[in-house]
Amino acid sequence: MAAPSPVRVKLLFDYPPPAIPESCMFWLLLDAKRCRVVTDLASIIRHKYMDGQGGGISLYVEDCLLPPGESILVIRDNDSIRVKWDGAAIERNQEAETCNDGAQNKSKKRHWKKSEDECDSGHKRKKQKSSSTQVDLKSGKDGGIRDKRKPSPPMECNASDPEELRESGRKTHKGKRTKKKSEAPIENPPDKHSRKCPPQASNKALKLSWKRQTSSSDSSDTSSCSDQPTPTTQQKPQSSAKRQNQAATRESVTHSVSPKAVNGISSTKNKKADAPISSSDMDTAVGGNETLICPVPPEDLSTHIQQHSQSPTSDSAESIELVIKKSNASLSSLTDNRVAGVSDKLSPNVSGRGRGRGEDFSWRGQRGRWFRGQGNNSNRGRGRGDSSNVFYKYNTEKEKQQQLEESATNVSIIIQNPQETMKRDYSSLPLLAAAPQVGKLIAFKLLEVSENYTPEVSEYKEGKILSFDPVTKQIEMEIISQQTMRKPGKFDVVYQSEDGEDIVEYAVPQESKVMLNWNTLIEPRLLMEKESQVQC
C-alpha cells in the first residue's frame, strides 16, 4: 500500500482570522502523516490562523460536518472546507462592548465638563451677588454714620396720644435720676479724698465717675430729645463746670499728700501691682462713706504727720493719727510674726508645733514636721505612721569577755577516702562458645537501658548458671556481682508506704535471678574456681 501523500485543501472562514486578517480564503497543504483524525486538522488551523486562541472550531465539507473523531482520510484533494470559529463572534461582541463603554465615558466626561462650567458660572454669580450686597451694606453703614452725626430733627408730640406722653415722662424721670446719681460723688468735699486716698486711685475714680456721668447724660439727652427739641450747645457749660470741679479735686489731693508719702505709696504699689481693682471698689472709694487706707512705712508717716501738724485743720490731723495707729499696729504684728519665725528657725531644740492643726494634747502625738536633719522622731505626728527605724546595739565589751572566757579545744578530724575496689581484668579469662555446665560461674556483658533510657553495653557481670535448656537456649542465672542502685527515672513509678518509705517500681526490673537467652550475652567468659574463691 502506498504511503499517503500531502493533500491540498481550500479553507473558507466566515470572518478573517486574527493571525492573517487580509482574507477569508486560504490554501492549506495538509500532510496526512502528521494528522490521523479531524481534530488534528482543527488544532493545526487554530495554531496557524487563530494564534492559539480559544473557541470551538467546526469543519464542514459541502455543508456536512466533519466529526472530530473521524479519520483524516475523509478529506480529499482540492476539497473546500468551511471553518466555523466561535471565538470570532465573542471577539466582535467584546469590541462592540468596548465601543459602547468608550461612548458612555465620553458622554460622562462631557456631562462632567458641563456641570463644572455650570458650577463655575454659579460661583461667579454668587460672588457678584455677594460683592453687590457688600457694597450696599457699606453704603448703608456710611449713611447710618452720617445720619448719627447729623442732629436729629425735633419730634412733634401730639397731645391726642396720652400713652406716648406717659412714656416720654418716664424717660425724663429716669434721665434726671441718673444725673443726680452721677453728680453725687462730685458734690463731696475734696478734703476726705485728699486725706485718705492716693492721687492715682483718686484720678482713676474720677475718670470712672466722669465716664458714667457722660454716658448717663448721653442717655438722658437722647430720651429727652424724643419729647422736646433741645439744642446741643447746652451741654458745653455743664461739661466745663465738671472739668473745673475735677481740677479742684486734683489740686487739693496733690497739696494734701506730701512727696515722701507719695514715694512710699508708689513703692508699695509696685509690690502689689497685681491686685485687681474692680469698678465697684472705685465707686465706694469715691462715694465718701468708705475710705481707702494706704499702708505707708513709719518714716514717711512721721514726716507726713510733722507737715500736717502745722496745718490749722484739726479734723485732718485726727484722721491721720487714726490711720497711723492702725498702720503701726499692723506693722508691729507683722514684725512680731517675722521675729518669731526667725527665732523658730534659729533654735533647733524648740519643742513647738509644726505646721499641723490644733494644739498639743497629751493623748495626741506632736503634729507637724521638723526641719530636715534636725529634731528627733518624737517631733513627727502619728497621722501617717512613725517611720522610725529600730537599730539594735550590741555591747562589744560583753562579746569580748565571752570570747576570752571560752575554752579553746583543738580537734583534728581525719577525712579518709573509701578504699577503691580494684577492678578485675576479665580479658584474660577464656571465652565461651557454648553454655557451660550447670553450677559454673561466668562473666558476661548485657545490652541495657541507661539512666537516660538509651541502650548501652554494661560492664562485666558475674553470674551462676542454675539451669540451661539446649533447645530454646534459655539460661536461668543468678547474678552474684553487686548491682548499683540507680535513681528512679521518668518512666519509673515511686510509691510511698505507710511508714513513709519510698518504694520504686522500675520499668526495667533489677532482680537477682534472671532468665536470659544465650545469644544475648556479650563476651561470655568462664570464671575459674580459684578466682571465685578469692573474690568470696
UniProtKB/Swiss-Prot annotation:
Sequence repeats (start-end): 353-358, 380-385
Swiss-Prot/TrEMBL keywords: Nucleus, Repeat
An example Gene Ontology biological process: spliceosomal snRNP assembly
The keyword Nucleus is annotated on this UniProt entry: yes
Subcellular location: Nucleus
GO molecular function: U1 snRNA binding; U2 snRNA binding
Gene Ontology annotations for the cellular component aspect, listed alphabetically: Cajal body; sphere organelle
Biased composition (Polar residues): 239-257, 303-316
Feature: compositional bias, Basic and acidic residues: 181-192
InterPro entries, sorted: Coilin, Coilin_N, Tudor_Coilin
Pfam families: Coilin_N (PF15862), Tudor_Coilin (PF23086)
Region (2 X 6 AA repeats of R-G-R-G-R-G): 353-385
Region annotated Disordered, chain positions: 96-316, 368-387
Biased composition (Low complexity): 213-238, 371-380
UniProt superkingdom: Eukaryota
Chief subcellular location: nucleus
Domain statement: The atypical Tudor domain at the C-terminus contains two large unstructured loops, and doesn't bind methylated residues.
The family this protein is said to belong to: Belongs to the coilin family.
Protein name (Swiss-Prot/TrEMBL): Coilin
The gene coding this protein: coil
